[in-house]
Amino acid sequence: KSFDNIYAYGLMNEPHDLDSCTTWFEMAQLCIDSIRTVDMDTRIMVGGNHWSSAERWVELSDTLKYLKDPADKLAFEAHVYFDADASGTYKRGYDEDSCYLEKGIDRVRPFVEWLKANKFEGMVGEYGIPDSDSRWNLVLDKFLSYLQENDINGCYWAAGPWWPKDEFMAITPVDGKDR
């Protein structure tokens, strides 16, 4: 509360395997209520149900639009990966994952449209691509352009010197060379 460099309180990263979205809704509301007893100034970031899936946001996290924040400073966080099951494991290649240039846009659009329809702020808290095929970069470029066009911020998943050199999604240069 006393630090001016805190952007938001993140309630939980990738809630999943809960009984229902209502359960996550109830937990999130309790957290919001508790935080607001001590801090009315800092934004609260709420991740979506089922791994914060942007693609399935309306299906699995729509009830979050009914959360109440007396400070009116809620924001929402979704995650997006471009592989076949949207897990970010990229177990198969670009072709085997049936990837195409607008796949990232198609995956994030439900979340972006939900934010707009409900007049909420939000961000993509995780996205990333493997370094195994340069075509993933083209998908990422289109995705990032779409986020920029819609004033949505995002965070790449694997960056920083603590990632192993062989981490397939890391973007940190290795031995002075960009990936």
Stretches with model-predicted labels:
Residues 133, 164-165:
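Short secondary-structure boundary/hinge segments and terminal tails
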Residues 3-8, 12-152, 170-178:
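Extracellular glycoside hydrolase catalytic/binding regions
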